[in-house]
Amino acid sequence: GTGAIVEYFGEGATSMSCTGKGTSCNMGAEIGATTSTFGYDDSMRRYLTATGRADVVEAADKVADYLTADAEVYANPEQYFDELIEINLTELEPYINGPFTPDRGTPVSKMKEEAAKNDWPIKVEWGLIGSCTNSSYEDMSRAVSIVNQAVELGITPKAEFGINPGSEQIRYTIERDGIIAAFEKMGTKVFTNACGPCIGQWDREGADKGEKNTIVHSFNRNFSKRADGNPNTHAFVTSPEMVAALAISGRLDFNPITDKLLNDNGEEVMFKPPFGDELPTKGFEVKDPGFQAPAANGSSVQVIVSPDSSRLQLLEPFQPWDGQNITGAKLLIKAFGKCTTDHISMAGPWLRFRGHLDNISNNMLIGAENAFNNKTNSVKNQLTGEYAEVPTVQRAYKAANIPSIVVGDQNYGEGSSREHAAMEPRHLGVKAVLVKSFA
């Protein structure tokens, strides 16, 4: 998918909900896609209407023919697309992706074999649903259908369970419709409507011990140390309903399609297929969406930031290119293997500095593995001959007015669209990033 525009079409694509399409497009970043797209269809009309945007539907309908490919393209797709991949959704079984990367997929029927072969921890410690992906009304309603079955069947969940609603509108609506209460009946922790555990914004007890463990979640990314700072946390990505089933069973190798569970009375029980509503039957509702409209005329608005602030810093324009070739550059780091935005600019505790470019630049490339010594955050300062942290060495080059370059591998920059991953190297004086391909 690197460098490609991926278009989804066909009966299967049409059958998906609008928010389901949104999840597929969101996660297109993990295959390196430049853009992921679905043609305009009824699912989008339904969603836009339900969310109070009938005016957008009216405008889109006027140009609907231009918001999807021509009929002859879909009739003979081989003639028009560079590559054609056919997926039969009726034959597609659930996948569990990971650990440490979302592009390593294992069919649920093969997980027992793969886990044993790779020595992945079988016991599931946490199941997590939500954040920006897989957190729609449909996602929550399908997941809670599994939770309700567990309650009815008398099964006590074997793992801890948490949810992050996708927005205040989703949180308010699922609370009104009893979905949150159903989750809480099973002991689920309801986190705030934010990134949360997806980027380490939670207080996970015991993570500092560095013990080998497994968590499953429906977030879009699961890179090493991302969820809790523990490099031994094996994080797996799967659908919300699969997260619910795995958390209830407490086992990574549980297949809800074929496997039985013992309830609290020692009886063998099985889950029925999940189900849920694409959109709330009573409509969406929210009291305070958190939106503050900007001033009608902002020309007189002044932004005042304390020069002593460690969290906020006004941006200064970058120096423009002087038109000359880069000469005398030092190699800052040759990153080995995967170098995602998490490797380039970690989240978690660093997010407090996201409004202060200089301070957050102290995390630049600290997660990248140096190809010359196979260590993270350890590169050779070519001015002193000593090894030091990546940002420290780069600041030394900048102070000496010496340009530097970064070398990477395939799909450099895969992951969250954090602007810091692009801004930090430039802020600290890196002149070029040389890789086989960019995400």
PLM region spans:
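Mobile "lid/hinge" segments at catalytic clefts and subdomain interfaces of large enzymes
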Residues: 1-58, 155, 189, 201-289
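Conserved structured core elements
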Residues: 2, 18-22, 38, 42, ...
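Active-site lining segments that contact anionic ligands and/or coordinate catalytic metals
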Residues: 3, 82-84, 124, 158, ...
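Accessory "access/gating" subregions that flank catalytic or transport cores
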Residues: 7-13, 29-158, 162-205, 298-325, ...
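General structural signal for secondary-structure boundaries
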Residues: 17, 54, 88, 107-110, ...
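A generic hydrophobic-helix recognition signal that picks specific residues
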Residues: 123-125, 232, 330, 408
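Feature captures the catalytic cores and cofactor-binding loops of soluble hydro-lyases/lyases
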Residues: 144-164, 168-231, 249, 317-319, ...
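Acidic, Ser/Thr-rich low-complexity intrinsically disordered segments
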Residues: 268-318
